[in-house]
Amino acid sequence: EFRDRRRMFFATFFAFLGAMYGIVFANNLVWLYFFWEITTLSSFLLIGYKETDESKTNAMRALSMNLMGGLGFALAIVLLGHAGIDNLADLRAQGAASQLVVAAAGLLAFAGIAKAAQFPFAGWLRGAMVAPTPVSALLHSSTMVKAGVYLVLRLSPNLEGTKVGMAVALVG
């Protein structure tokens, strides 16, 4: 048994869904990162919703894996800020023009791979099954995984023909 926290559950659930819309529609990297991390925090809260030891452990695992990806995302924003690039359209227009752009695209791809629960980050997704059924279905079937895949696809012009692109292709 656990205490009734349905209001928090649905508020977090809808924040998660809203953040997914933000990821799809954001062009600015800082806004994209903002929505990206809302999905991380929301998934942590939703996986740990039941407040059992198992759900808390799996929520922390999901949080740590996704925060590693978020760190890569933040580092990419810093690198791209030095190059004067602050949105995905400008990043894609650069292609693989410089090592800095390719490195930043690689860090963003790392974030996408972590969010998509690709090897070696797949461990958190299995543990997410302790969450209530709508959450585990949402995390497994569509949103978190597809958010990572979506970001990697948007970066494909920057990774094409590079060693980083080959590494991403091998992993994902």
Residues covered by each model-derived region:
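...captures the hydrophobic TM-helix bundle architecture rather than a specific catalytic motif
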Residues: 1-172
